[in-house]
């Protein structure tokens, strides 16, 4: 029910780049799945990351340049069925931080008072996955074919594999910088 409700809500938004949304969501979920044991995340956190991935750019309908903050507001106030109030707050925070963590935003959302420290730590981790996925598709060209996430006792490693038109995608990204 939750996924259907989020998809229905998303379909009402005048967003244009659905491929980017699906792609970023898939990359974030791939990282979650590969590093899940390290962070000891329950299944429901994966679901919330999935929902946040679908909603991460919703705020663009209000203001492109501060869309992460607006995505959080829209997610927190959307009439979406299938999650608890706490889960809606968690998802809103994940969308808020998909361009980096902000203590200012965390303090400005009064509903965060219902969250535990562990839940806020999970939000930081999940939003980091979403932020990394977003940065891997900054040019909206879907140039990455696969991410392989590994770890050692002292590091987390990510190997990025490019797909079709790899060189052209890299040139496009370099020119845009």
Protein language model features and the residues they cover:
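Divalent metal-dependent catalytic cores for phosphoryl transfer on phosphate-bearing substrates
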Residues: 6-11, 20, 29-149
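Conserved small/polar residues in nucleotide/adenosyl-binding loops
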Residues: 172-177
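A short interface-forming secondary-structure element
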Residues: 158-171
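Cytosolic transmitter module of two-component histidine kinases
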Residues: 16-17
């Amino acid at each position: 029910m939750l996924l259907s409700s989020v998809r229905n809500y998303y379909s009402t938004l005048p967003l244009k780049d659905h491929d980017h949304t699906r792609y970023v969501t898939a990359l974030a979920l791939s990282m979650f799945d590969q590093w899940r044991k390290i962070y000891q995340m329950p299944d429901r956190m994966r679901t919330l990351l999935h929902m946040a991935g679908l909603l991460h750019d919703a705020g663009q309908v209000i203001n492109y340049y501060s869309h992460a903050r607006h995505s959080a507001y829209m997610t927190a106030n959307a009439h979406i069925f299938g999650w608890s109030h706490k889960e809606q707050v968690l998802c809103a925070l994940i969308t808020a931080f998909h361009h980096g963590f902000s203590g200012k935003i965390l303090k400005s959302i009064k509903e965060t008072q219902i969250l535990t420290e562990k839940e806020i730590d999970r939000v930081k981790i999940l939003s980091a996955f979403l932020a990394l996925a977003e940065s891997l598709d900054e040019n909206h060209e879907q140039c990455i074919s696969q991410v392989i996430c590994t770890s050692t006792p002292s590091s987390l490693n990510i190997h990025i594999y490019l797909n079709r038109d790899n060189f052209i995608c890299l040139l496009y990204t370099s020119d845009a910088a």
